[in-house]
Amino acid sequence: MKGIILAGGSGTRLHPITRGVSKQLLPIYDKPMIYYPLSVLMLAGIREILIITTPEDKGYFQRLLGDGSEFGIQLEYAEQPSPDGLAQAFIIGETFLNGEPSCLVLGDNIFFGQGFSPKLRHVAARTEGATVFGYQVMDPERFGVVEFDDNFRAISLEEKPKQPKSNWAVTGLYFYDSKVVEYAKQVKPSERGELEITSINQMYLEAGNLTVELLGRGFAWLDTGTHDSLIEASTFVQTVEKRQGFKIACLEEIAWRNGWLDDEGVKRAASSLAKTGYGQYLLELLRARPRQY
């Protein structure tokens, strides 16, 4: 399985901040935003990842993340010249995917919760169909909403419904089998002129192959598309890290625990960050070897 992070767009809701920098490079407490979706793919056991961004921002991501080797992964980059919809990611990434199943995560979504990695790996092991992740919200009319049966098979999908059929919002995390590129090519532009991911999900639903995985109590799903939500996400990460003493979305730690990075690799990363709390945290990992997250 391969991963795609969609980190394009113009971030208009965050202007003037994003006039000079990609939204996905903004800080969420102690890390760039892009670290958080990257961590999701790594927790799922995915090592080959494509980052899709704008032509203007691609160089900045390459400077930050390189080829991914310092995190034990392989990174490639592609351009989305204009924000023409989430489904376009699979058309842009067709050569990269090369017929393999994939996971798409949006570059401005943050996920956190106990047992997240086993849940992700369980979904990644499925060989057919698609899986979306549902998160219960108080205001479902603001989201894409999924309705499902007792076997967690999707029954309906609605975009910002006036009368929602459930309180389960569809998050920015999707797993697909190898048919996704074929489906993406069939998607027609919506009324707003975009290739909608909901159209792909609807195709899987109509084929009886759309499963819903729930992120229940204890899970956090944060969108960082507004000024207030940026602060809220940073405060959340700060609170958890200070209270519990471990870091959220520490890519070197995930790679190390996955066996993709050895002790020397962690030491090299720590030495370049020696004057920061992040670097000290990496060194402490090697000394204490604390519990799994």
UniProtKB/Swiss-Prot annotation:
It catalyses: dTTP + alpha-D-glucose 1-phosphate + H(+) = dTDP-alpha-D-glucose + diphosphate. Binds 1 Mg(2+) ion per subunit. Pathway: Nucleotide-sugar biosynthesis; dTDP-4-acetamido-4,6-dideoxygalactose biosynthesis; Bacterial outer membrane biogenesis; enterobacterial common antigen biosynthesis. Pfam families: NTP_transferase. One of its GO terms (cellular component) is cytosol. One of its GO terms (molecular function) is magnesium ion binding. Mg(2+) binds at D108, D223. Its cofactor is Mg(2+). One of its GO terms (biological process) is enterobacterial common antigen biosynthetic process. Gene3D superfamilies: Spore Coat Polysaccharide Biosynthesis Protein SpsA, Chain A. The keyword Transcription regulation does not apply. It comes from the Bacteria. InterPro entries: G1P_thy_trans_s (IPR005907), NTP_transferase_dom (IPR005835), Nucleotide-diphossugar_trans (IPR029044). Keywords: Exopolysaccharide synthesis, Magnesium, Metal-binding, Nucleotidyltransferase, Transferase. Its EC number is 2.7.7.24. The keyword Endoplasmic reticulum does not apply. Catalyzes the formation of dTDP-glucose, from dTTP and glucose 1-phosphate, as well as its pyrophosphorolysis. Homotetramer; arranged as a dimer of dimers. Belongs to the glucose-1-phosphate thymidylyltransferase family. This is Glucose-1-phosphate thymidylyltransferase 2. The lineage of its organism: Bacteria, Pseudomonadati, Pseudomonadota, Gammaproteobacteria, Enterobacterales.
